[in-house]
Amino acid sequence: MDKSITYQDVRGAKHLIEFYDLLTEGYNIDKYIINNTLFRRPDHQFKGLVNLLKPSSIVYDIGAYIGTFSIPMAIEGMKLHAFEGFPDNHVRCKKNTSPYDIINHSCAVSNKQQVVESKFNNCMANGNNEVATINYVIFDDYMAENNLPEPDMVKVDIEGMETLALHGMTNLIENVRPIWQMGYHFKFYSTVEGYPGWVDVKDGGYDFQNFDRLGYLIFNEFGQRVHPAILNYRGGEFIFIPHEKIRRK
């Protein structure tokens, strides 16, 4: 089904967004669009993020799904690159984002480059998914090979795969040092073949305490600064800001 919802930008102007081919079942964000509650979610609050950026800032949306984050950020005047690894979702994302000059990339991110077959394709939960081919890339390499511009902000929402994907973002984390909006899926393990989900540090997963060691400050979904140890015991939405980008009053 299709659905139009209204987004109000930080200046108060209202924009009608059209989403196409929404799923009516499964574990996905579509139901929030259908119920018109998308912009009540903590991961879809944009005012604080926009205030951290300048107009025309470059934003990467990793795990773009169908464009629900990319579109509002583009409306706010940012330049978006949307990365979606699952073919069905990528097709829908391109369709939804076509009016907004968003650049779409069909790739998933991991700690190694490989092509796998997986049923984790369109976030359906009925067990009837067809197997799809997923193209995993090492993100630092993908940026270099495709001559992508360095981002000012990176949003990551990849259902636990952040524990592997960030191993392939060393240059991005340590040298480019963007602001991060992290969908942190703590202990979100997967049993789906071809999609490992969360990997513990002891098993080779990325140690998120590295952000603290590298001088990033951690903020929760309410914009409150929190101790980095919070990442050792709960998930949620977090913003990682390099200390040099904190605006001092």
Predicted feature residues:
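Core alpha/beta nucleotide-donor-binding catalytic domains of modification enzymes
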Residues: 87-125
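Short, glycine/acidic-enriched loop or turn micro-motifs at the edges of active sites
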Residues: 64-66, 87, 111, 158-160, ...
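Conserved acidic-Pro-Pro-aromatic motif
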Residues: 76, 142-249
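A short, compositionally biased
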Residues: 1-4, 112-114, 212-214
